[in-house]
């Protein structure tokens, strides 16, 4: 049994005088049930154990409810159903929580839903990919899964235990064990936040990436072409946004704020472009830490990105 969602988080303004089209997220959201029609499903991963292990600033375990509150009062422009499937809560046993989340993702995908994960530290990424891989392996012997990560960090660290700094190395190892290609594209890499050893590791693994300074509004055509080339090489897409890819002024509520970062307008545009490819199967938003946020700026950014993925 999975815990029921806390529907009390879905509260906000009601514009009844404006008619039926004056809808907001909190009015449209429904608790998930196994007989629900295929639609978008929000699934939280309330964890910052990976952040703690990675020597970061804790608080991301409070991200999922903060993100729901930020979503609740947004105008709803969709027609399809949307459901809240609650949170997988991680304590000290991160690995068990990742397994639980992966199985939940696989089950939801098997029922035809598109899952949007709400983090939580970026340790959500390994759990998300594992769930997608589990689902696709039931139908394809050699699925070509692309991983699109908007992030200031490669997250390819070597460590004795899983953390928020290791998920894509773990995914690479999972792909190697399954004899699958490791197709990883990272947009927004900070040269000063990744050691030479991590750049070497990325090169060995064939990671495609663009630096934060290359992802500029005035250089959008190059970024689009880079993304399109990656999307053409895969059949299925897992998209993850680590909020520290954004400038600290836009997203202060993360463990490791970016001095440079990539503007929200660029990130949102490329997220929408990836979604429009028709290959998106699973997405998540990671590293929202409301304890470090200022005036809910980061939560609002995260909510807008979730809306971009859903509507």
UniProtKB/Swiss-Prot annotation:
UniProt entry tagged with the keyword Cytoplasm: no
Pathway where it operates: Amino-acid degradation; L-histidine degradation into L-glutamate; L-glutamate from N-formimidoyl-L-glutamate (hydrolase route): step 1/1
Cofactor: Mn(2+)
Presence of keyword Membrane: no
PROSITE patterns assigned: ARGINASE_2 (PS51409)
Chemical reaction(s) catalysed: N-formimidoyl-L-glutamate + H2O = formamide + L-glutamate
Gene Ontology biological process terms in this record: L-histidine catabolic process to glutamate and formamide; L-histidine catabolic process to glutamate and formate; putrescine biosynthetic process from arginine, via agmatine
Keywords: Histidine metabolism, Hydrolase, Manganese, Metal-binding
UniProt-listed Pfam families: Arginase
Enzyme Commission code(s) on record: 3.5.3.8
Binding site for Mn(2+) 2: 151, 153, 242, 244
Comment on bound cofactor: Binds 2 manganese ions per subunit.
CDD domains the record matches: Formimidoylglutamase
Positions that bind Mn(2+) 1: 122, 151, 155, 242
InterPro entries associated with the record: HutG, Ureohydrolase, Ureohydrolase_dom_sf
Gene Ontology MF annotations: agmatinase activity; formimidoylglutamase activity; manganese ion binding
Family according to the record: Belongs to the arginase family.
PANTHER family: ARGINASE/AGMATINASE, FORMIMIDOYLGLUTAMASE
Job of this protein: Catalyzes the conversion of N-formimidoyl-L-glutamate to L-glutamate and formamide.
Identification of the protein by name: Formimidoylglutamase
């Amino acid at each position: 049994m999975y815990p029921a969602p806390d529907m009390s988080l879905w509260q906000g303004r009601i514009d009844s005088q404006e008619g039926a089209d004056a809808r907001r997220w909190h009015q449209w959201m429904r608790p998930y049930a196994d007989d629900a029609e295929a639609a978008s499903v929000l699934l939280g991963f309330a964890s910052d154990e990976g952040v703690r292990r990675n020597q970061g600033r804790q608080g991301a375990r409070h991200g999922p409810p903060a993100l729901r509150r930020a979503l609740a009062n947004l105008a709803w422009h969709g027609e399809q159903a949307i459901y809240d499937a609650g949170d997988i809560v991680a304590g000290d046993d991160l690995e068990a929580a990742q397994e639980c989340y992966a199985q939940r993702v696989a089950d939801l995908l098997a029922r035809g839903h598109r899952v949007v994960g709400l983090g939580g530290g970026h340790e959500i990424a390994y759990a998300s990919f594992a769930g997608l891989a589990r689902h696709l392996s039931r139908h394809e012997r050699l699925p070509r899964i692309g991983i699109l990560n908007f992030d200031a960090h490669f997250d390819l660290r070597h460590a004795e235990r899983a953390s928020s700094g290791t998920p894509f190395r773990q995914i690479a190892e999972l792909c190697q064990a399954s004899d699958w290609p490791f197709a990883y594209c990272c947009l927004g890499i900070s040269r000063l936040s990744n050691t030479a050893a991590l750049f070497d590791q990325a090169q060995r693994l064939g990671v495609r990436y663009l630096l934060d300074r290359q992802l500029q509004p005035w250089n959008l055509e190059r970024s689009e072409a880079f993304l399109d080339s990656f999307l053409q090489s895969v059949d299925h897409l897992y998209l993850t946004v680590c909020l520290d890819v954004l400038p600290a002024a836009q997203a202060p509520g993360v463990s490791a704020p970016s001095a440079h970062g990539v503007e929200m307008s660029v990130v949102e545009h490329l997220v929408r472009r990836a979604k429009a490819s028709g290959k998106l199967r699973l997405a998540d938003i990671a590293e929202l830490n409301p304890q470090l946020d200022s005036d809910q700026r980061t939560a609002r950014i995260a909510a807008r990105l979730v809306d971009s993925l859903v509507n």
